[in-house]
A protein has these predicted regions:
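Short, contiguous pre-domain boundary segments
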Residues: 3-22
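Short amphipathic alpha-helical segments with coiled-coil-like heptad repeat character
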Residues: 41-45, 94, 205-209
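C-terminal catalytic domain of Rieske-type non-heme iron oxygenases
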Residues: 73, 84, 144, 149-303
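A broad, structural surface signal
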Residues: 33, 37, 41, 84-87, ...
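Non-catalytic accessory segments flanking enzyme active sites
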Residues: 19-64, 69
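Rieske [2Fe-2S] iron-sulfur-binding domain
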Residues: 52-156, 160, 164-167
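Short Pro/Gly-enriched beta-strand edge/turn motifs at strand-loop
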Residues: 41-53, 122-127, 264-269
Length: 303
């Protein structure tokens, strides 16, 4: 209803005032390092979708901001996230991108770990010498699942309260039913600095000029219905056929997806965009090595 009102009146949701941000907020390297540490290493970030590791025994590996990760689901269905490095000499424990197995052996000296991170085998232990297996498991990173998303903190030993982090936005996230979608394809995309990249996910001002051959012809440029829950956001974008609702009684309206697109943004790095034809576009946005680079893992899901 809000989107239709904007369409009829040629308006959009607006901030109370304009905000001008200095270029240095995007390019200053000292500020970049401080923000990257506080936002991406000491706070919860989204690292995967539950549907990517759906079954007990499934695993996935990634390298995020230089940190090699091994994400597993154990036999009880619990999700785990480890630094993908052997505790002996630092070799990568698992080189496969994804698969199904319950144990992982380091290719260097064959130390073996369970998918719960426990050290369960030391090659030639009798001659190697005693190893305190209880303290030499894979380095765990705190992680939890909520609403089909895997969240983790990249600083070992640091935890978080995901319910407090998401707040009332948790219900909006759960409504997306992300665990019920299917992964069609994925890719990594290089780009500008993480804040400049993230800005592009939070407005539709660019739709007509940038997306003229894709979603642009179907959506109304610079018409936005915007709501926030703390740092998390939802954008509603009107499709051009929304004018049809002027001739339909409210109680006879079809599903909203026929007339709008909805984008949910989970701070700091996850964008969930329902797009045309029963597909969903997922973006995991991570800072690159400098203030002017970024890496985005983009997934396309099908219903």
């Amino acid at each position: 209803q809000r989107a239709l009102k904007h369409f009829n009146e040629g308006t959009t949701d607006r901030a109370p005032s304009q905000l001008t941000v200095p270029v240095s907020a995007y390019t200053d390297e000292a500020q970049f390092e401080a923000e990257r540490q506080a936002v991406y290493f000491e706070s919860p970030i989204a690292i995967a979708l539950s549907l990517e590791i759906p079954e007990p025994g499934d695993f996935q590996t990634q390298t995020i901001m230089g940190v090699p990760l091994l994400i597993t689901r154990d036999r009880d269905g619990l999700i785990h996230c480890f630094i993908n490095v052997c505790r002996h000499r630092g070799a990568k424990v698992c080189s496969a991108e994804k698969g199904h197995q319950s144990r992982f052996s380091c290719p260097y000296h064959a130390w073996t770990y369970s998918n719960r991170g426990d050290l369960i085998g030391v090659y030639g232990e009798d001659s190697f010498g005693g190893v305190d297996r209880a303290t030499m498991g894979l380095t765990a990173l705190y992680c939890v699942e909520r609403a089909g998303v895997v969240f983790a903190c990249l600083t070992p030993g640091k935890s978080f309260d995901i319910d407090n982090w998401l707040g009332e936005f948790a219900d909006k996230l759960a409504d997306q039913k992300l665990a019920d979608w299917h992964l069609y394809t994925e890719r990594w995309l290089p780009g500008a600095g993480w804040k400049a990249t993230l800005d592009g996910y939070l407005e539709v001002y660019h739709h007509d000029s940038v997306h003229g051959k894709t979603v642009g012809p179907y959506t109304v440029g610079n018409l936005l219905v915007h709501d926030t829950w703390g740092a998390h956001q939802r954008m509603v974008i009107a499709k051009k056929n929304i004018s049809e609702l002027n001739d339909i009684e409210l109680d006879s309206w079809e599903s909203p997806e026929s007339y709008i697109r909805v984008v949910h943004s989970v701070f700091p790095n996850l964008s969930i965009s329902a797009i045309l034809g029963g597909h969903c576009l997922i973006g995991f946005i991570y800072p690159g090595e400098t203030s002017t680079t970024t890496a985005t893992r983009q997934l396309i899901l099908s219903a």
